[in-house]
From Swiss-Prot:
SUPFAM superfamilies given in the database record: Class II aaRS and biotin synthetases, Putative anticodon-binding domain of alanyl-tRNA synthetase (AlaRS), ThrRS/AlaRS common domain, Translation proteins
Chain's role: Catalyzes the attachment of alanine to tRNA(Ala) in a two-step reaction: alanine is first activated by ATP to form Ala-AMP and then transferred to the acceptor end of tRNA(Ala). Also edits incorrectly charged Ser-tRNA(Ala) and Gly-tRNA(Ala) via its editing domain.
Identification of the protein by name: Alanine--tRNA ligase
Major localization class: cytoplasm
PANTHER family: ALANINE--TRNA LIGASE, CYTOPLASMIC (PTHR11777:SF9), ALANYL-TRNA SYNTHETASE (PTHR11777)
Compartment(s) where it occurs, according to its Swiss-Prot or TrEMBL record: Cytoplasm
Gene (name only): alaS
CDD domains with a match to the protein in the record: AlaRS_core
Organism phylogeny: Bacteria, Pseudomonadati, Chlamydiota, Chlamydiia, Chlamydiales
CC terms in the record's Gene Ontology section: cytosol
GO molecular function: alanine-tRNA ligase activity; aminoacyl-tRNA deacylase activity; ATP binding; tRNA binding; zinc ion binding
Enzyme class: ligase
Catalytic activity annotation: tRNA(Ala) + L-alanine + ATP = L-alanyl-tRNA(Ala) + AMP + diphosphate
Family note: Belongs to the class-II aminoacyl-tRNA synthetase family.
Amino acid sequence: MLSNTLRSNFLKFYANRNHTPVASSPVFPHNDPSILFTNAGMNQFKNIFLGKEQTSYTRATTSQKCIRAGGKHNDLENVGHTSRHLTFFEMLGNFSFGDYFKQDAISFAWEVSLSIFNFDPDFIYATVHEKDDEAFALWEKYLPTDRIFRLTDKDNFWSMADTGPCGFCSELLFDRGEKFGKAASPLEDVDGERFLEYWNLVFMEFNRTSDGTLLALQKKCVDTGAGLERLVSLLAETETVFEADVLRHLISKIENLSGTTYSPTEAKGAAFRVIADHIRSLSFAIADGLLPGNTERGYVLRKILRRAVNYGKRLGFNRPFLADVVPSLVDVMGEAYPELSASVTQIQEVLTTEEEHFFKTLQRGGNLLQQVLKSSASSAKISGEDAFKLKDTYGLPIDEIALLAKDYNYAIDMDTFEKLEVEAKERSRKNTKKTKNDSDSVFQDLDPTNTSEFIGYDTLSCDTFIEGIIKYNEIASSLEEGDEGAIILRTTPFYAGKGGQIGDSGEIFCESGTFLVSHTIAPKAGLIVHLGKLSQGSLTTTMAVTAQVNQNLRKKTANNHTGCHLLHKALEMTLGEHIRQAGSYVDSQKIRLDFTHNKALSPEDLLAIETLVNEKIRENDPVTIREVLYSDVMSSSEIKQFFGDKYGDIVRVVSAGFSHELCGGTHAQATGDIGYFRITKEHAVATGIRRIEATTGEDAENIAREQDVDLNEIATVIQSPKDQILVKIRSVMEEKKDLAKQVADLENQLVQQQVKTLLTSCEKICDTSYLVYYLTEEEGQRIQHYANAIHKEIPTNFISLWITEKNGRYIVLSRVSDDLTKRGVQAHTLLAELLAPYGGRCGGKAISAQGSSAELPQIEFLNKTLRQWISTQLA
């Protein structure tokens, strides 16, 4: 594959020029709610650009997985209908963090364009910002001035946000020739098809203040991005990105599955392009730990899947098919992205489950569509509200709705539809926009040099100094008795909550006062904050203090954390290698582990998992911790890493018996320290995600003791030895079942006897028999039995109405024989008209309906009303 060669050569080029190759971050940022998806190579370096994080390197190069399908950058609706829009793409990039600037960035880009991309220099053009004389002069070394263009802020100024780092940018374009347009220069190429942009170089040299002032940055940075798919298309000289390399390989697989040949110019061509693109977004997102859902990123992922399914229908796919395309994707991208290969089973299971669910939804949507078409008949126009509901709820694209409307010669109220679209996007924007509370803000406002050294792996107590105090969400210099606040220490043994493990609690004290630490957090890189309350005395900044972690709680938390690792490995060994951690929480009392699995665990599964963990505890293996290069870990299949997480150059490997994981948390010294492991609960938390809750040590033993006490009480109540409890309970259940059958038989006999009497009470009109009967509250418990029995006796031309009372309301059941429903007589219509005057409500079908009402007239009036209704219906 050309893309594999280009990617590899690009990264090698920059690695040979002292750039550190950095692995792609996940397609969705775990710690940045300001964006839905990773949409550029610079996303993972955002805090470095902002000066909030330090790194061991000043130059980096990446091939970043990106998704543009939500928020500010949303290409979803264009995919399949243009030559180059994609929801998933790879962005090649090189970065400088206060190292080189424009001269080297431009020099590197020119060399790569010629030696790696093999572009003819006579067809390369550049744009610069109209005020960027430096960049213009640098490009003059490589290009004639008539192929360098000055553009405005709109095209050549980049900013991360309204305030903060920003700067001029320079774009590289390639002239694809007159075949793609008659424009003589990029300025005339309105749609950008002939002069195709292939690389953007961003020069971050300013810091924009809230009033718009541009101040010079102390550290100037470079951020570049080149779309790999676009480069491949240029080199392969294809008209669109879909005719080359990976995407064409996927289209070939779709051709094979559908039995339909792809033609770029035919209407069905869009379906091939949509599926080929969307399967990449879906697969990489699931591999990185995201699942389809009803909110935020999960909702966008579900929209992508449903869009792919809808386009698949145009190719004849009327059953789940996306999972069948996944192996072809892994064949061509699995080597570059091992997380894809490791997650094949999980990806396929999630896709199939979602597709099955959506096909059922589409059946309901099809019914709704027919209702919409029927209700629109008089105006020959589908309302904007209905069109939006079909698109938003059932995933029917607006162009598909438009085609259906065209078949009926209907118009669509597009003004209302587009208004609702805008409102929905605004709601989505507000939901995903990062909200900063006051406490977040005050932490960000702290001096960047105000950091803490964590020494808590080796000790639980140390003498240190107070570096900072926060009180009432403001930076302060002291805390007085009773004050709640936060303390920052120069060095600290307190573990800050992260990676699923709760932060430490304990005390910070000196002769002047004692601060009770309730929780410890790390609001930003390098900063450890101790939250709590001053129980006595006073404390001020710069004071010498002692920091003491609660030893008992730390030990129990550490044991639980190691137990969580053993549980994770036991799940994988018991259920299969598709198991992946989807979240965890560990404190001193419990373990909570979320994992990918599509069905509930059987009692046998849970017993096997619990037994395996306890076996490893009894083996009392030492828990070893070592720091290694992340590059070494990437080549090891033994060490469990979480592909959705971001790691530094040096990582911490925790080994406990058969478990080996990357982890920054605290752990037991040996597996035997855990003592005993007990699963307390297993349940679903989302589609494809299960959760196990467990505990260890004394807490687990207490649960076992409590259950033993319960067993003793049960044995006493049912008068059985403990070892015979199950036999006795089964015997009692069988007796109960037999008694229930006897009761049911007696009730049926009672109903049958009463029905024989009721047959003589039936009246007749229009050759149709009918009955109105009031049941006592006790009889009303068998209201369906009565209706079934009498309609069995009178199977045709018969309508019955049954009334009883329950909880102060009237319960009404209407039944209509099947032959009458074919003549237009509907049970739910009868009941709705009958209850409407009294504020009642009902539901049901043509043959049977049930409702309730606080009021009803006398039975004689109901009898008369039913008689009149039948006469009207069958006249």
